[in-house]
Each structure stands twice: as C-alpha cells, then as structure tokens.
Regions:
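Short N-proximal segments of mature Sec-exported proteins
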Residues: 46, 222-232, 238, 242-253
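Sec-dependent N-terminal signal peptides
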Residues: 1-4
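Structural signature of tandem alpha-helical TPR/SEL1-like repeats
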Residues: 23-30, 58-67, 94-106, 130-142, ...
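Hydrophobic face of amphipathic alpha-helices that form TPR/SEL1-like repeat modules
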Residues: 46-53, 57, 82-89, 93, ...
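Short helix-capping/linker turns of helical repeat alpha-solenoids
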Residues: 37-40, 53-55, 60, 73-76, ...
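Terminal, low-structured helical/coil segments at or just beyond the last alpha-helical repeat
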Residues: 20-23, 257-296
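N-terminal leader/linker segments that initiate helical-solenoid repeat arrays
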Residues: 7-49, 294
Length: 296
C-alpha cells in the first residue's frame, strides 16, 4: 500500500534507509515536531539528536537542547544525561554547572554509569556542588562495580590517596588492574610506574614497561614522560639520552606540564649532534600524531 505524505512549503525531511528490512521512509520534520509536542519521548529524543548532529536538518544546538530537555523532564535517562552535559559545557544553553549537577544526579538515580561517574567528579572537585569526598567515592564505586573503567580508576586513586575513604593500597591495586584491563590509559600509566618501582606490587620492569608503552601508543602525555624517565634512568632498558630527550620532547608537545624541564635537563649531558638526532626523531613522532612512535 502506498502512503502519500504531503509536505508544506516550509517542510524539511529526512530520508533514512532501513538496511534490515530494505525499506525507505520519509520522516517529515514538521510531523515529528508535532508528535514530539504531544509528549512522545522517543520522538523528542530523536529530534534532539537530529538537531545536534545535523541529520537532515541544519545543526541547531538550541533546538537540540530544547528537545532533549522535554524528554529529560519526562524521566528519560539518556536525555537527562545529554541535558546535563550541555549545561555543563554551555552548549545550546547558558553554562550552568549547578543545573548540570542536578541533571547528572537525576540520571544517576537509575544507575547510569556515565552519570554516576560525573556526579563523583563534581562531588570530588566541587563542580556545581560542594566538595564531598565521601559522596564522590560512593558514586564512583557504584559505577566501578558496574565495570565503568574511568570510575574504577577514580576509586583506585581515592583508595591509594585516602580520599573520602581510608587508604587501602591492596584494594587500590585491584581497582587499578581492573581499570587497566579495560583499557583505561590513566590506570595503565600509573600502574606501570608502580610495577617499575615496586609500589604495592612486586617489582617488575617487564610488566611496568608493558603498561606504560600501552598507554603511550594511545597518545597519553604522562606515559610519554615516563618513557623519557625509563630511558634516562635505564629502567629495564639501557640508558639512552637521545631516547630520553625524544620522549620528554614528545611529552612536552603533548601538553605534559613538567616534561620541558626534564627535556632541558637531559640536553645538558648531550652533544649538539645527539640533540639534533633526538629532535628529528621527535618531529617524526609528531607527524604520527604522537601515536605509534614506539619503534624508535
């Protein structure tokens, strides 16, 4: 049966192919907006996404925020999360950290891992709410127990430093390992340094280098800096001033705050030719966007 949809002069439409069923549907944006105004949450969420991504309509962050907010007010968790992030960053609306915290908290009540992690951060650093390390830890822990790798890292950090909870290096290592095993580069880098130094774990240069190199291949600035230290101090590898300078230079370019000082320190014991060689290697690494440079 053929259904005709008449479009008014102001109509915009989206053509979407359904690869599963081989169907082609035309969704009139005006029709979608009327449906959304009637309270259909899925359509409100869809319109928010369309305006956010420019799917068949011009990008419009204000309209995107408006439709996400309509769905969020009806309890839709994905919409609540998007509203919170837009308020936090001032996208499509005025920046409002306190309001962002409220919406993250609403989404967190459903157990949403992303929301729980954000609530934890806001409690930890006093963003949009007062600092409360105990609440931060509890929020992180709820997400960590559901295998959210970033939350696992934060739980580990707080246990390691005794923030909002008693220090517990044994449990901190467990959470660092869980986070690293899920690919969290912060956890890989820090855990790698623990293995190199034997902090909370048996000393293992092999395991330490494996973790730090893994983080470095993903472009982690602190891992670049740690590779510089590895070569400068000869931790599991022969000492090499050129490679130390190289990695300090790469870390500096990547935004690591103290790497420049280490690079300049390394240069004091190097010849001009060695410095030029290290700089050339660093430039080659930069052309690779600082990733996959471990072959040097």
């Amino acid at each position: 049966m053929l259904t005709l949809v008449f479009l008014t002069w102001h109509a915009a439409y989206v053509v979407a192919d359904d690869k599963q069923g081989g169907l082609s549907t035309i969704s009139h944006v005006g029709f979608l907006e009327e449906k959304a105004k009637s309270g259909d949450i899925k359509t409100q969420l869809r319109l928010g996404t369309m305006y956010r991504d420019g799917q068949g309509v011009p990008r419009n962050s204000q309209k995107s925020f408006y439709w996400f907010l309509q769905a969020a007010n009806k309890g839709n968790v994905p919409a609540q999360l998007r509203v919170a992030k837009m308020l936090e960053r001032g996208v499509g609306t005025n920046e409002n950290k306190a309001a962002a915290f409220i919406w993250f908290s609403k989404a967190a009540k459903s157990g949403n891992n992303d929301a729980l992690t954000n609530v934890g951060k806001m409690h930890q650093f006093g963003i949009g709410t007062q600092i409360d390390l105990q609440k931060a830890f509890r929020s992180y822990l709820r997400a960590a127990e559901q295998n959210q790798s970033e939350a696992q890292f934060h739980v580990a950090q707080m246990l390691y430093k005794g923030l909002g909870i008693n220090k517990d290096m044994g449990n901190a290592i467990i959470w660092f390992e869980k986070s690293a095993n899920q690919g969290n580069v912060d956890a890989k880098n820090l855990l790698g340094t623990f293995y190199l130094k034997g902090i909370g774990v048996p000393k293992s240069t092999d395991r330490g280098l494996e973790l730090i190199i893994s983080a470095a291949t993903e472009g982690h600035p602190a891992a670049f800096h740690n590779l510089g230290l590895v070569y400068q101090l000869g931790l599991g590898v022969p000492r090499n001033d050129i490679y130390a300078y190289l990695w300090f230079a790469v870390a500096t370019k990547s935004g690591h705050q103290s790497a420049k000082r280490f690079r300049e320190g390394a240069a004091l014991s190097m010849t001009p030719d060695a410095i030029n060689t290290a700089r050339a290697l660093a430039s080659a690494c930069e052309r690779k966007n600082f990733k996959m440079c471990i072959s040097f």
